[in-house]
């Protein structure tokens, strides 16, 4: 959902494309997606 994408972007300062990729890779879990981006 849109709010999950916005949450990932706001927490990681990444671009939209990267946020969507991370969410897809994490099964739509924003917390996991944020951790994934931050640990890359």
At which residue positions do the language-model features occur?
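Short, amphipathic alpha-helical interaction segments embedded in low-complexity terminal/linker regions
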Residues: 1-40
């Amino acid at each position: 959902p849109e709010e999950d994408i916005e949450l990932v972007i706001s927490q990681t300062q990444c671009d939209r494309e990267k946020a969507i990729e991370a969410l897809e890779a994490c099964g739509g879990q924003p917390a996991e997606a944020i951790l994934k981006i931050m640990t890359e």
